[in-house]
Regions:
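Small-residue-rich segments of transmembrane alpha-helices in multi-pass membrane proteins
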Residues: 2-18, 75-88, 128-142, 177-190, ...
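Hydrophobic core segments of alpha-helical transmembrane domains in multi-pass membrane proteins
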Residues: 101-110, 150-158, 205-209, 270-273
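Alpha-helical membrane-inserting segments
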Residues: 14-22, 26, 83, 87, ...
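Membrane-interface junctions of multi-pass transporters
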Residues: 118-208, 230
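Short, highly charged, low-complexity non-transmembrane loops/tails of multi-pass membrane proteins
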Residues: 292-300
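Membrane-interface alpha-helices at helix entry/exit sites of multi-pass transporters
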Residues: 2-3, 65-81, 86-87, 168-172, ...
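Transmembrane alpha-helices that form the ion-translocation and gating core
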Residues: 2-62, 189-274, 279-293
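Alpha-helical transmembrane bundle and helix-membrane interface signal
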Residues: 26-29, 56-106
Length: 300
């Protein structure tokens, strides 16, 4: 909990500071429906995001996923992921529709309780149909409540257990989604970029956000390492792995843009930051793993 907490709390402080710099040095960053505090908190939380699916794939490629070190990192990232989406839900609260949002949360809680009792009693094939209906219903109702359908989709997955589904079919389903839907998502994402404030301004903002994201995550994890007395170099390795942004960051930024909390220019800067963050991770981490082989053996 110490590591997860510091890895979650420190990066938003760095990111919020970067957002304040953006507000003071230029215009065109805050969306039409966004308050300055929503922009600052949203950008701050964006700097704390860890792309859990991409992190899993990277650690699998590095052959540390199923080692104790990999499982620790996965646990840290999972706890942060839940907290970040919770904060996003608060950012998106619409006080004009707070009644709907309260109704959604109450209905979701009751339905989640019923679903968790129902699913273990269903046949394996029926669980797939029920889970897809559950996903669609949560996304639709979250959007109706003024949150976002992606928030609903995330909440729908939180209450499902992987043990309810056959791993082979889950892998096939994931591969199908990645093959069919992800190219369309990235195409639509690319079409939403905007350079009206100027390429230099966007790239400058992206560099500032990248610095805040990496420095914030490393600072938080290094502080945890000092408290927990980790071996030298261990905090840097874990910090670099936890700062990977990739797909989840892009989804996060899309939600902020859909709700007009940020502009297309801010979205473009966040997108550039996410790409740079992801591209940097593997080249930085591989030499660290080689240098820290004795530490890994001790941890394993």
């Amino acid at each position: 909990m110490t590591t997860s907490g510091l890895a979650l709390v420190v990066p938003p402080l760095f990111g919020s500071a970067a957002a304040l710099v953006m507000l003071r040095t230029g215009t065109g960053w805050v969306g039409a429906d966004g308050a300055p505090w929503q922009f600052v908190v949203g950008i701050g939380m964006a700097c704390a995001v860890t792309a859990l699916p991409i992190l899993v794939l990277l650690m699998e490629k590095l052959e540390i996923l199923r080692q104790p070190l990999g499982q620790r990192i996965l646990r840290y990232a999972s706890l942060d992921d839940v907290a970040i989406w919770g904060v996003l839900a608060v950012i998106l609260l619409d006080w004009e529709r707070v009644g709907r949002q309260l109704a959604f949360l109450l209905l979701f809680g009751a339905a989640a309780w019923a679903l968790r009792r129902l699913m273990p009693r269903l046949a394996a094939n029926d669980r797939w149909a029920v889970s897809l209906i559950w996903l669609i219903a949560c996304g639709f109702l979250a959007d109706w409540a003024g949150l976002h359908y992606m928030v609903g989709a995330f909440l729908s997955g939180v209450v499902l257990e992987s043990a309810w589904f056959e791993q082979k079919r889950m892998d096939q389903f994931r591969d199908t989604v990645l093959l069919v839907m992800m190219p369309v998502f990235f195409l639509s994402t690319g079409l939403r970029t905007n350079w009206d404030v100027g390429g230099a301004a966007v790239f400058g903002a992206a560099a500032l956000l990248l610095l805040a994201s990496v420095a914030g995550k490393l600072a938080g994890v290094h502080l945890a390492g000092r408290i927990l007395k980790w071996a030298p170099g261990e905090a840097s390795l874990i910090g670099w792995l936890l700062q990977i942004k990739a797909l989840i960051m892009i989804i996060f930024a899309n939600i902020l843009l859909d709700k007009a909390i940020i502009t297309n220019e801010s979205f473009t800067a966040l997108l550039c930051m996410a790409v740079a963050s992801t591209m940097l991770t593997s080249p930085v981490v591989k030499p660290m793993l080689a240098r820290l082989a004795p530490v890994r053996q001790r941890l394993d």
